[in-house]
Curated annotation (Swiss-Prot):
The gene is APOA4. This is Apolipoprotein A-IV. GO terms for molecular function: cholesterol transfer activity; phosphatidylcholine-sterol O-acyltransferase activator activity; phospholipid binding. It comes from the Eukaryota. Residues 33-330 are annotated as: 13 X 22 AA approximate tandem repeats. Homodimer. May have a role in chylomicrons and VLDL secretion and catabolism. Required for efficient activation of lipoprotein lipase by ApoC-II; potent activator of LCAT. Apoa-IV is a major component of HDL and chylomicrons.
Amino acid sequence: MFLKAVVLTLSLVAVTGAQAEVSANQVATVVWDYFSQLSNNAKEAVEHLQKSELTQQLNALFQDKIGQVNTYTDNLQKKLVPFATELHERLRKDSEKLKEEIRKELEELRARLLPHADEVSRKIGDNMHELQQRLGPYAEELRTQVNTHAERLRNQLTAHAQRMETTLRQNVDNLQASLTPYADELKAKIDQNVEELKGHLTPYADELKVKIDQNVEDLRRSLAPYAQDVQEKLNHQLEGLAFQMKKNAEELKAKISANADELRQKLVPVAEVVRGKLRDNTEELQKSLAELSSHLDRQVEEFRRNVGPYGETFNKALLQQVEELRQKLGPYAGDVEDHLSFLEKDLRDKVNSFFSTLEEKENQDMLVAVPEPQLTPVPLES
């Protein structure tokens, strides 16, 4: 039985690795972006549903992300594309229906909260203050970490470039043999340092999600006494708020990662230029190394300036979303168009459920497919 468990574990690792290449989040984003794009176009374009175009976009996920075809990914692709296109159809049909449901939900909530409008507004205001207190240190810490790790990256790469300059002066007669290892190592150091930079900065988004859950739960408890007979409707609105706030956290993570990748893309070509000039004369190579150091300084400084303020921008966005909830629940809200966030949340929940169900079935199939090891009886000694 132990051997069977080991084989199963290894199989699961292989499946998980393959599945990670195409995630539920990626699929949901493709479907949602396509839906939003059609919704924003002219009516004639919306009526002409481009099923083939959506199918192409979904298939492109597999072409771009998966290096080799295996049973799991092939099965996933065959089942996913029809599911996602059908889901897109339902989005278009459910949009107006959900819009009306949310309108009625907010009407009932406002009517129930109206006698306590001032207290409700004050409670939400208190929650915004608590949220600001919780998030403030994270924004400052993110800026500090960006500065610290960007400076560390700059120092390490600059020191490497300086070692190349020293080697250049000491080995004028044999430049290519002396500097080729340094040039190769420089590119590796760029990749390594950028990955370390991402590794230090992107976990902030996950920590922020925990703070968001805490804050939304605090808000739910503080408003519960005023919404005793409409608690489910209040919970639904708070779920929508949490979804929007966590989406901002995911976008923060993606922006940090994208900026780090962009930094890498700007640094690597310069390192390759230096390597390509190892056969040139000493003067040309010295010029390239000087340009490399200057380029490192500029690009790292640009990264620091771009990413440093992200924390403050994120905090403002979350506070604005809580303020919008206060306005929605207030007596003078008017018509509020916020059903799309609930529609997107429902879409992502369905895609996550699809992936979970498929993964569970795949694991069960593997469990059945792995045979019990047969133990050969050992003859007793006579």
